[in-house]
Amino acid sequence: MSQLETRTEPMVVNFGPHHPSMHGVLRLVVTLDGEDVVDCEPVIGYLHRGMEKIAENRTSVMFVPYVSRMDYAAGMFYEAIVVNAPERLANISVPKRASYIRVLMLELNRIANHLLWLGPFLADVGAQTPFFYIFREREMIYDLWEAATGQRLINNNYFRIGGVACDLPWGWLEKCQDFCDWFGPKIDEYEKLITNNPIFRRRIEGLGAIGRDEAINWSLSGPMLRASGVPWDLRKVDHYECYDDFDWDVAWEKEGDCYARYRVRIEEMRQSLKILRQACDMIPGGPTENLEAQRMAEGKTSPFMGFDYQYVAKKVAPTFKIPNGELYTRLESGKGEIGVFLQGNNDVTPWRFKIRAADLNNLQILPHILKGAKVADIMAILGSIDVIMGSVDR
């Protein structure tokens, strides 16, 4: 008697763009053969707002409030990159104290970014409790941001060409140290709950594995790259701001799967705490902004006693011109390498302003690592990438 063969027709299923596990308005057109993923096509662009064209029609300081809407989970990374580009092109130095303040804000953003990744990722794989814990810690970071910038999450508008908008208020550094002392044991609490949990490990170990060469060839960055055995961190490589003043290590793993990406982000939060503690202890005195970018006159060539040269605006001067030239500048955000290609033509607005989003590049590998996976694993693999669609679509 011949054995009966069961044949299934491929089925096309749409995930998103309104499903909560999509982490924004992302749509996945998935082709299934039973429970197995045969193909996946990400459909992006639902949150496109023309950020690059807006930048090309705004002065450098006018564009800063826009950028935190791109990565609305940790917007100060984009604030930093859009002021770093004109600073380097115009050769404007940043005072040491301002650089330390920037590092404090960026590392708080990194922790907040990883926390907001951790909660939904664990909820996607079935662990609901930590989702509520992460907002307890983020609330303390919100309080620190509110005290320093006036805003709690987005539109902090704190970074300026040549420094920051204002100095830290009295007692802020002590509050930041209190947060570091309080948050360290909370990371241990997460690890006790999650890291060696046998159910969690069986659920995600081996899922979405990416080899070292694959990660490099797909231009991955951030935790996606470091979890695949490449200890590449722009804070160490490019030596920007004052990261060389601190003692910290690059977090990386070799396995390249969802579990390795989780371990990298947990360790990155520990390293961010180390940097925060050192920055609070070592921060120097001095100014928090370079006034040269705020003078109405064009640089040091104008008469020193002239009215325009002596007048210093509260913000970057509206006559600040981006010099002729072009450059690409980058930094390490919580999701990976974000960068700006800036082309100036001696005008107050840039000729070209190209934004490189880390999560857009990281998302491109999703169809490759989903093929052969089970339909139930789609959310776990997508969640491990950490995408924010405001940044992907721009």
UniProtKB/Swiss-Prot annotation:
It comes from the Bacteria. Keywords: Membrane, NAD, NADP, Plastoquinone, Quinone, Thylakoid, Translocase, Transport. Its main location: membrane. It is an enzyme of class 7 (translocase). It is found in: Cellular thylakoid membrane. Gene3D superfamilies: Cytochrome-c3 Hydrogenase, chain B. It catalyses: a plastoquinone + NADH + (n+1) H(+)(in) = a plastoquinol + NAD(+) + n H(+)(out); a plastoquinone + NADPH + (n+1) H(+)(in) = a plastoquinol + NADP(+) + n H(+)(out). It is a peripheral membrane protein. InterPro entries: NADH_Q_OxRdtase_suD, NADH_UbQ_OxRdtase_49kDa_CS, NDH1_su_D/H, NiFe-Hase_large. GO terms for molecular function: NAD binding; oxidoreductase activity, acting on NAD(P)H, quinone or similar compound as acceptor; quinone binding. Its EC number is 7.1.1.-. The keyword Translocase applies. PROSITE patterns: COMPLEX1_49K. HAMAP family: NDH1_NuoD. NDH-1 shuttles electrons from an unknown electron donor, via FMN and iron-sulfur (Fe-S) centers, to quinones in the respiratory and/or the photosynthetic chain. The immediate electron acceptor for the enzyme in this species is believed to be plastoquinone. Couples the redox reaction to proton translocation, and thus conserves the redox energy in a proton gradient. Cyanobacterial NDH-1 also plays a role in inorganic carbon-concentration. PANTHER family: NADH DEHYDROGENASE [UBIQUINONE] IRON-SULFUR PROTEIN 2, MITOCHONDRIAL (PTHR11993:SF10), NADH-UBIQUINONE OXIDOREDUCTASE 49 KDA SUBUNIT (PTHR11993). NDH-1 can be composed of about 15 different subunits; different subcomplexes with different compositions have been identified which probably have different functions. This is NAD(P)H-quinone oxidoreductase subunit H. The lineage of its organism: Bacteria, Bacillati, Cyanobacteriota, Cyanophyceae, Synechococcales.
